[in-house]
Amino acid sequence: MNVVNESPRRKELIRQAAQLFVQEGFDRTTVRMLAHEMGIKSGSLFHHFRDKQEILAAVIEEGTYNALTLARQALAECGDSPNERLHAMARAHLETLLTDRNAHVVALYEWRSLDAKAREHLSHLRDAYEELWERVIDEALAAGLIEGDRFLVSRFVMGALNWTVRWYDPEGVHKPEDLARELVSMMVSSAAT
């Protein structure tokens, strides 16, 4: 199962499905609703996807793949200091959340709706993303930049970042860069006291 596909039409269908899954929830979304939202007949949907599960997997895979790609790029382009790397990861995560919001919300709240085969297939992407965070947090811990248990620190950081999809206003005064800077500042300040 490799649901990442470069077809522009398929990408648009995935984007529309993500929006509908966020609005209605995966369980309440029917194939007929998806087809209507996408402007196609129900049967035509199966030209692109085997079933609704594959659509969900495609939404989550594309969102997670994009997050992983952006995070790797941010780390490759930032400096070597733990502070810069922590900031780059936070900024990349926020940019992913805020530019690909629906796919991320679906990944956060509908992971449990994936069947076992899809979860197994997608776990490598999620694990790779979490490993990047753990590595950056380990570097910050080793440098004394932050303190705490790596598992707990990573869960608190991810939770704080992920919650921004609920309250952040892209039209507001704060930009993703501001949020990333503030998060890292709070983490570093708490270790200094």
Regions found by a protein language model. Give the residues of each.
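Hydrophobic alpha-helical connector segments
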Residues: A58, Q73-N102, V153-V157
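Helix-turn-helix
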Residues: E12, Q16, L20-E54, A58
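Conserved hydrophobic residue
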Residues: F26-D27, I146, H174
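Short, structured helix-loop boundary elements
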Residues: R10-K11, V31, Q53, A57, ...
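Amphipathic alpha-helical packing segments from all-alpha helical-bundle domains
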Residues: E62-R72, K117-A142, F151-R155, D178-R181
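Short coil/turn segments at alpha/beta junctions that flank glycine-rich nucleotide-binding fingerprints
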Residues: Q23-E24, C78, D100, A143
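Amphipathic alpha-helical segments used for helix-helix packing
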Residues: L98-K117, R166
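C-terminal peripheral helix-coil segments that are non-catalytic and often amphipathic
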Residues: A92-E95, T99, E130-E139, M158-A160, ...
